Amino acid sequence: MKLPRQSIINRFPDLHIHQTIDEIRELLTNGFDDSQKTIFLCGKDKSDKKSLRYKFSTFLSQEKGITLTYPEDLFEDLLEGQGKNSLLSLETQLADSVDLIVLIPESPGSFAELGAFSMDKALAEKMLVMRMGEFKSGKSFINHGPVRLVRTHGGESPRII
């Protein structure tokens, strides 16, 4: 499937996406067995074809041995009619059971996920945070708060792109 060239995400050319997919593939296979791997993919609405998350889901869904999981699918299934569970506790349970959390902070919900997950060392160690070009540097709460926590928890190999 060929992706549309027109995109609001101008700072992530398709070549860069392919390179990052290769990095994700390496993270999943380096030091692991060859069993099925599950990626929790967070970002802008997965149906928004202009989002970076949509592009990554398109590429990763074609990879053998990878299952993608989305926060909104969890919400639809588990929260229908339930008032006692918080979104954060349910999402944390799911994120805790996956091999890799790929988080693209490109929407209010994904900003909240980044903040929440960065506070949990076990989850932060599983995170690959992909900041869009214009947000990679500069003074911001995201860079000086959650991103620093992920770097701290990531040890020798923090996963911040």
Model-based region annotation:
Residues 1-161:
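Conserved catalytic or regulatory cores that recognize and/or transform ribose-phosphate-containing ligands
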